[in-house]
Curated annotation (Swiss-Prot):
InterPro entries listed in its UniProt record: Aldolase_TIM, Indole-3-glycerol_P_synth, Indole-3-glycerol_P_synth_dom, Indole-3-GlycerolPSynthase_CS, RibuloseP-bd_barrel
Lineage, highest ranks first: Bacteria, Pseudomonadati, Campylobacterota, Epsilonproteobacteria, Campylobacterales
Family listed: Belongs to the TrpC family.
Annotated protein name in UniProt: Indole-3-glycerol phosphate synthase
Gene this chain is encoded by: trpC
Annotated organism of origin: Aliarcobacter butzleri (strain RM4018)
Catalytic activity: 1-(2-carboxyphenylamino)-1-deoxy-D-ribulose 5-phosphate + H(+) = (1S,2R)-1-C-(indol-3-yl)glycerol 3-phosphate + CO2 + H2O
Domain of life: Bacteria
Length: 263
């Protein structure tokens, strides 16, 4: 299964990174940070004034699609998102399968005020400390990649650093884990990370089981206003969109159109 493969590679990378800078030294570096992460919840919760919230993703490649954008300039893409109403920006930092880079995060942080998500396969506190050091305001934790104890521990460590957490789920078992970790932002990924198959009815199945005080993010396969409208009506607050924005002629036009879905 590709998820297991990515996790294995991530753990190998972590061994090398820890040899260069151990966890204690990394945590010491966190004390030099002057600003606190933004309160992401206020940016992602749907309101009457701004019902559609968008997390726009900086994404060069994926295991299912290969290279998505050849002429890839992460900063230019992030600036376009920031200037055209994205509520948050997701920055892929996984290097092997998604061609991401941690440096993208710090480069973008220096140029935009929009909240930033470190999108990666996080399995260790080390990666969470890195996320804060490089400028993330929130991180992704994938329920499928962690057992309940691990998810809870990583969630609590992130919150101790004032980082918010997007906990990604794909089924009822994941949802139970997410709720037991006290997640406040729950992402429903329509794509099965084991098979890459899409289930666009997943929000319809899972949202009714989620307490109303949670913020719900719909992920994968969101590519037109009809899908956004339908998922918003089911209960999604925000939409994480990456590949679609990477392929359109004008990010500005597409983002503006999506933001105005209900107008």
């Amino acid at each position: 299964m590709i998820l297991d493969e990515i996790i294995e590679k991530t753990k190998e990378d972590l061994i090398l990174r820890k040899e260069k800078l151990n966890f204690e030294e990394l945590e010491k570096k966190l004390k030099t940070i002057n600003s606190k992460p933004k309160d992401v919840k206020t940016f992602l919760k749907s309101t009457k004034e701004e019902p559609i919230r968008i997390i726009a993703e900086v994404k060069k490649a994926s295991p299912s699609k290969g290279i998505i954008k050849e002429d890839f300039n992460p900063l230019e893409i992030a600036l376009e998102y920031s200037q055209n109403g994205a509520n948050a920006i997701s920055v892929l930092t996984e290097p092997h399968y998604f061609k991401g880079n941690l440096e993208y995060l710090s480069t973008i942080k220096n140029s935009v005020s929009t909240p930033l998500l470190r999108k990666d396969f996080i399995v260790d506190k080390y990666q969470i400390a890195e996320a804060l050091l490089y400028g993330a305001d929130f991180i992704l934790l994938i329920a499928k990649a962690l057992n309940e104890k691990e998810l809870k521990e990583l969630y609590e460590y992130a919150r101790s650093l004032d980082l918010e957490v997007l906990v990604e789920i794909h089924d009822n078992e994941d949802l139970t884990k997410a709720l037991n970790s006290n997640a406040t932002i729950i992402g429903i990924n329509h794509r099965n990370l084991g098979t890459f198959e899409m289930d666009m009815a997943l929000c319809d199945k899972l949202i009714p089981l989620i307490p109303k005080d949670k913020i719900i993010v719909a992920e994968s396969g969101v590519s037109d206003t009809e899908v956004i409208k339908r998922l918003h009506n089911v209960g999604a607050d925000a939409f994480l969109i990456g590949e679609h924005f990477m392929r359109v002629p004008s990010i500005k036009d597409e983002l503006t159109k999506f933001k105005n879905t209900l107008n």
